[in-house]
Amino acid sequence: MNIFFFIPSLEKGGIERSLSRISRKLIELGWDVTLLTNELSIEGKSYFEDSIKIIKVETPFENKKFLLFQLLNNFLLFIKFRKIINNHKPKFVLAAKNFPLAIMLKKFSKNKFKLILREAVDPYVAANTQRNFILERIILFLKKKLYPKSDRIIAISQGVKDSLVNKLSIDAKMINVVYNPAADEKIIDLSLEITDDYSFKNYTIVNIGRLTRQKDHLTLLKAFKLVIKETKCNLLIIGEGSERQNIENYIRNNDLENYVKLLGYKSNPWKYLSRSNLFVLSSIWEGFGNVIVESMLLGIPVISSRCKSGPAEILDNGKYGNLYDIYDHNKLSELILHEISSKELENSSNIAKKRSKDFSIDKITESYIKSFEELLT
């Protein structure tokens, strides 16, 4: 069976990591997998093994921000991608980004493939981050009209599906919930690598993710400021992004330089995660929350915001880790202090490891294959 993974912009991130794991397993099972892209970063390519075929289409308008150039770029991509699809004749196309272009390809390609859209974020929450009411309405209108033109939608959490059904009026029967394959056993081996730029002398809280407004590091820092008034510990933040300056300013203005370390982007964050005592996710919203599962796989306790959509589902509403309401730094500080003083680490660690198996590559890929095969009956 042949399938195209349609990712016009292949960068470093959760989408790429998840799809690389699924593609690897599909190839093991005998599937013919091809990755179709327009922008291919070194980091993005590094997620995928040599066994997967990658077709990169060149256009003269790559990385252009002006609207006219973006429209021209999409038109050229449509022409070139359509030719490739007609020549290769994939049975399925799984689109992870640029859904309008994917739907246009389905409508106007000679090869009649089955189109699956992989929705990784609550579309309503994502639209609201635009900070432009008119643009928000346009995005939601387009999604409401275009999504039903696909053959199947894979939502990476129940919360994402609920939003698609309740807010965009999409038929629930065409949506399957399939979580991310975040419990990759390779992480365990990578976690054993030596760390030479940080010593874990004190109790260490770790946060891993892009430094963006979505990740809400300021709430974490406010909570941490309260925590260090009560006990000695450190905060390790791994990631890079547009909010770095604001985070650095807060650390400096609140005299936290001796307690907080920003390590920047790390290709192997798991070697730091495995040596930490606690992982905290402070996001305002998430599609899923891969790093929560990765923490559980490594036996690291988790505290997460109760944000839309994935974290509370992963933690089963607090059964496998503590939750707090977004922006509530006081509650977060209480939970951190409780975790630091907890005597049940070994038991909770074993329970978390067991829960992480629900997100194994084998189990999740099996669900993807089932979703594909349903379209052939």
PLM features: what roles do these ranges have?
Residues 265, 284:
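Aromatic "clamp/platform" in nucleotide-sugar-dependent glycosyltransferases that forms part
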Residues 317-329, 338-343:
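Conserved acidic donor-binding segment of nucleotide-sugar-dependent glycosyltransferases
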Residues 104, 148-175, 182:
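A short, active-site helix/loop in glycosyltransferases that binds the activated sugar's phosphate group
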Residues 301-305:
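Short hydrophobic beta-strand element within catalytic cores of glycosyltransferases
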Residues 31-32, 206, 212, 217-262, ...:
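A conserved nucleotide-sugar
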